[in-house]
A protein has these predicted regions:
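Acidic catalytic/metal-coordinating carboxylates
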Residues: 45, 71-74
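The feature encodes the CheY-like receiver
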Residues: 68
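Two-component/phosphorelay signaling modules centered on CheY-like receiver
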Residues: 23-41
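Short amphipathic alpha-helix used as the core "switch/output" element in two-component signaling
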Residues: 73-85
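Acidic, metal-coordinating helix/loop segments flanking the phosphotransfer/catalytic sites
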Residues: 42-60
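Alpha4 helix (beta4-alpha4-beta5 surface) of REC/receiver domains from two-component response regulators
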Residues: 74, 95-111
Length: 125
C-alpha cells in the first residue's frame, strides 16, 4: 500500500474506524489517516468493534470482508441498520466472485481491493 499521505485536505471531522485483522494493513491505514489529521480507532476483529462505542453518522468504517469469526459482511449489515449511518468502505483481497457473493442483498458500499492505494482510499472519505 502507498502510505505516503496524499496532498488532500481532511474531508470531514468524524472518527475513522478500521476493522482489519492483518496488523500490517491496519497499521499502514492508521499511519496514513493519522498523518492526514484524522482520528483513527483500530479493531482487530468484528467482536472488538461491536464491544466499542458505536460509530456515528459523521464517522467512516473501513472493514475487511475477510475477517475471521464474524465476517465483514455481517459488520456491514449491522452498520446499514444504524441511523444515522456511518460511511462504509469495504476492503478485501478476495476475487470478484467472492465479493459479489459476500455483498449480495446489501446496499451498495465502496469496495477497495488489496493492495490498497492511499490516494483512492482518501478520495472516498
Amino acid at each position: 500500500m502507498n502510505v505516503s499521505p496524499p496532498d488532500t485536505p481532511k474531508a470531514y471531522y468524524g472518527t475513522i474506524h478500521i476493522v482489519e485483522d492483518d496488523p500490517g494493513v491496519s497499521d499502514s491505514l492508521r499511519f496514513l489517516l493519522q498523518a492526514l489529521g484524522h482520528d483513527v480507532v483500530s479493531h482487530p476483529d468484528a467482536e472488538s468493534f461491536f464491544e466499542s462505542a458505536p460509530p456515528g453518522g459523521e464517522d467512516v468504517v473501513i472493514v475487511d470482508l475477510g475477517l475471521p469469526g464474524i465476517g465483514g459482511a455481517h459488520v456491514i449489515r449491522w452498520l446499514q441498520q444504524m441511523n444515522p449511518r456511518p460511511r462504509i468502505i469495504a476492503i478485501t483481497g478476495q476475487p470478484q466472485k467472492v465479493i459479489e457473493d459476500e455483498l449480495r442483498g446489501l446496499p451498495v458500499v465502496s469496495v477497495l481491493r488489496k493492495p490498497l492505494s492511499g490516494d483512492v482510499l482518501v478520495s472516498l472519505l
